Amino acid sequence: MKANKISGMIVNFDQSFFGEISFNEKIENIEEISNQESELFIIPGFVDLHCHGGGGFDTMQGKDAIKSMSEYHLNNGTTSLLATTWTSTFEKTHGALKDFNSLISENSNLLGVHLEGPFINPKKLGAQPALTQIPSEDFINEIIKEANVKTITLAPEIEGM
């Protein structure tokens, strides 16, 4: 199979140079080419560890919205992300986690879930709705069982932590 090629200013860790990248599903070769100029920059994809949505879609809006958000990020340079919830009712959060779980295997850029709330300090909500909860072991076990939870935002000073 013939490799695809792209050329431009390659930015990789601590160096940058004009070159050409050959790839199929994975990078096969990176070759430096001297005395060339390009307005195209080739950089590693971005990883978003706190993503509530994108392209007009929110992570709590259901499967179709999550798929659209995922595609939006892939098309705009975010190669992987943690779909992030916001503080909501148990039912809505549980439903969102089920949706994430069913889509993670289909969408290569969904690495898992960042559960933001509901275990945050009710006196320090920021933009979160006033739907905080005191965590219980059963609740946390149910959440972890339901989806590939990678990160949980919580307030260590609240009761139950």
Say what each PLM segment does:
Residues S22, F46-D48, D58, L82-T84, ...:
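Short, conserved beta-strand segments within well-ordered enzyme catalytic domains
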Residues N121-E146:
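Conserved phosphate-binding/catalytic loop of the ribokinase/pfkB sugar-kinase fold
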Residues S68, G95-S102, D138-E142:
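Alpha-helical scaffolding segments of alpha/beta enzyme cores, especially the outer helices
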Residues H52, K67-A96, S108-N121, E146-M161:
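Divalent metal-dependent hydrolysis catalytic cores, especially in the metallo-beta-lactamase
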Residues M1-N35:
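N-terminal metal-binding scaffold of metallo-dependent hydrolase/deaminase domains
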Residues Q61-A65, T132-D138, A155-G160:
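Short secondary-structure boundary/capping elements
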Residues E31-E39, H94-N107:
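Short amphipathic alpha-helices and their capping/turn segments at secondary-structure boundaries
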